[in-house]
């Protein structure tokens, strides 16, 4: 592969990553807007932090077991966020919240954790640090002779 071809592939990869980032941001903006009238900041952040932290924990396990980063890493937190907020989607369709909805990543219980969203932010940042550490460790092990 020539240097020019390698550079073209790298540029295409960067644009693809930008596309995934833009899609994830637009999707999350749509989810945030879906909470209008229901204390959007509190509810969106709660389920985002819980879903994304769960996804990052799963991604960390995959990195450790497969010894490489996960494919499409932005899809995992978005999918987990959607899963965590499923009871709210059901609520907008007319279904009242029930205790069994805690099956969706603790949908009801997560609102009653001491510290509320500050606690979930700390959990999210810890999960993010664990994932990035696992990815970095795998890359450094792969680059050793």
Question: Could you describe each region identified by the protein language model?
Answer:
Residues 1-145:
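N-terminal membrane-targeting hydrophobic helices
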